[in-house]
Amino acid sequence: MNNLKPFIYYDWKKTILKNAKESYSINEIIPKTFFMELHGTKITNSTLNGTWKAWNLTDEGEGSHPVLKCIIDDGYLDMNFGASSEKIPLKNVWIKLCMKINPNSDGTYSIPEKSSSFYIKDNSLKISKDNLILDKYLNKLMLSYFKNNIKNIEMFINKSRIQTKVVGDLSLLGWNTENSVSFRTMNEFIKKDNLYPKDFKAVYSYRKMTFTATGTFDSWEMTTGADGRNIRFKCPIKSAAYDLDGDVFNSSTENFLLIQVDLTYFDSKTTINDPTGENDGKQFNLKVKTNDDKLKNVLIVTYNLTDTDGSMSSEDKDFLSLAFRNWFNDNIQQFEQIFAYILLDETAKIPEYQWLKPTQISYGSASVETANDEPDLDASIFSAMSMVENNTNSTPSHAVDNRMLQLTKTQAAFGISFPLFIEHFLKQALLSSQFISVDDIVADINTLTITNNKQIIFGKVENSDGKNVDSSLKPGKLKLSLQNNLIVLELFDLTWEQGRGVTGHFDFRQEYELTLESKSEKQIPILKVHDEPEIEYYVEEAQWKANEDMIVSAVVGTVFSMILGAGMKLAGSALSKAGKLIRSKATTIKGRKKIYINRSNVRQLRKDSGVTEMELQRINRRNSSIASEDARFISNNGTTSIQTLGDMKKKPMSTGQRIAIGVKKITGTAVMFGAVGLGMNFGEMLINYINAMENNDYSAIPGINSFMQQCIGAMQWPDKDSELKVTFGKLQGIYLLGGTLEKNNKPNSK
């Protein structure tokens, strides 16, 4: 269970395709006409009038930020400048309206009233520096119109049959890995690098009037409200003088502009070092993107421009904003901040970690705001996403699950998708159990399951007749999987002859939790039992009736071996109590006698067994010793030969002990994240892990940070010398590791 709020993934491309394929249109609900006017105080009056042709969702939407393209059938923008006027035709002109939508409890969506989440992104009016005022007032009037008609827009959104997917656990949204930092951390990078433009002289001239803003910016800050593809920066003005065609005003405190830009990866010469790679990859730097149309490099979403006397009018501020628009679009390339460094197609020094090196890259962000609609810069997240091994993301977007840092409560995090975790951890873990050969194993990333694709011999077991017989599993009946963020081992229909010709069928299920614990002054991944096992047994009813006492005795022995980890001679009272329980649990279903031993039953049987803690420790040590001996036969590629497996399975032992020994090897392998390439072969490493777990001494075992170096070596943040020191680890829809960025083994003072 988790306390995360559900995450809603919006698929705008699928929404548009579905509506187009089914010829679904809702344009009949949009208003037919529009009208808006604005009366200036000194310079201009403006009027907007016309009729609508269509409103359409576009595939530019990201996350909960749809983009609505509103096309004008016919209309005009009338600008009056005292004695003169200009009438601009708007036939077939489109306006792109961006917004944020919030889900309601009744399945509908609403648009928050916060001004920065509702804005005009672009329009098709042909503009130049000479007529920016036309673009400004078209957008201003249109935005006022849309705000006055927000209920119509909400109705349009709610009728659009939006295709969504609700995700309870964390999701990388189709990406293989994600390297993330908080907005606050990114702002510390920006402040430290000091690469934002500081001094400005912004000028806008129109009809012999000139408006100038001259001053200095304080540190630019990444902030919330953008859709993921676009990134927003709050640009605080430290001090400025505003010259409004000869009238000069001084800026008051808390003046700022909120701008929005796109980012992109640029080719670069190699300037970073991946300590885990050969540094032969192609470097890309994530920077602000500039366009061919320099008037559209930067969007000013909103602003607060005030003077110390409070004398400037709204109209004055409009013209000042145009001056700043000119300046930002002309000078944004001076913002030389590199937000991330990536080495693409890098060769790992240790081949076993090649799967962590990016072969495709992207970026994204997600905003988190407080209950008071204030930016939560610690939980808001900026991410560099990647695909590895030439995998492809079939639904790529810049949307990011905004809950990652809310869960870790750290400044940085790294996520690995469950399909990768299955392929590179659990698959090897099941191979290491030596229950199965490499030829018999298959991974299903859709069900997050590793299983056997052929019938396998599980091992010899002594039956009630004193004979050593084979126990076997049919295809698909041995499973190691991820379920509800737990690693689950399951055996279904494990079958052998129990004696007197009776064939018994056992199911076994055990859940394990992957945690991160402080051991030997380092963070160590630990796979520990989550709860008691569940055991089920069935036999044909006719065989039960003919051999009940023998079957009950055999089932009791097997169940105790599964609970204790070995077959043992128990006191008569323990066997008697267990026998009564088995008989009481027997039910007849479709000609079969079935017995289900739940977790509560297992706890009672463990108690009734009379086995002391000292005896359990002895069993545990014995099983660890056997597991270590078995591990010596694992080759350096993590496999065991079929001949060796056959020899192991010929050694008779109780089913419970065979499972317990295999689990020792599974748990050792599943947490062996950072140990590859330490000069030992695979078997030796596994033995070290088994011994470390047995002795609770991890001094010779690499911590999780050795693995983290492999994860982030080719993906680095602006502070290239910092490393992610892991303090948090959890399976939560992804394998999530969180921590702090530290430099020279000391916390970064930024």
Curated annotation (Swiss-Prot):
One GO MF term attached to the UniProt entry: lipid binding
Swiss-Prot/TrEMBL induction comment: The toxin locus has divergently transcribed operons maximally expressed during early stationary phase. This is part of the orfX1-orfX2-orfX3 operon. A longer botR-orfX1-orfX2-orfX3 operon is also transcribed at lower levels. The crude toxin extract was isolated from cells that had been growing statically for 96 hours (at protein level).
A Pfam family reported for this protein in Swiss-Prot or TrEMBL: Clostridium_P47
Keyword Magnesium: no
Keywords: Lipid-binding, Virulence
InterPro entries in UniProt: Clostridium_P47
Oligomer and partners: Part of a crude toxin extract that includes BoNTA2/NTNH, P47, OrfX2 and OrfX3; OrfX1 was not detected.
Record comment regarding domains: Has 3 domains; the first 2 have an alpha helix wrapped by a beta-sheet and are structurally similar to tubular lipid-binding (TULIP) superfamily proteins, while the C-terminal domain is a mixed alpha-helix beta-sheet. The N-terminal domain (residues 6-168) folds very similarly to P47 (residues 35-175), another protein of the same locus. This structure is very similar to the OrfX1-OrfX3 complex from P.bifermentans (PDB:8BGM).
Family: Belongs to the TULIP P47 family.
Stated role: Part of a botulinum neurotoxin type A2 (BoNT) locus; may be part of a progenitor toxin complex required to protect BoNT during its passage through the host gastrointestinal tract. Binds phosphatidylinositol (3,4) bisphosphate, phosphatidylethanolamine and phosphatidylserine.
The protein, known as: Protein OrfX2
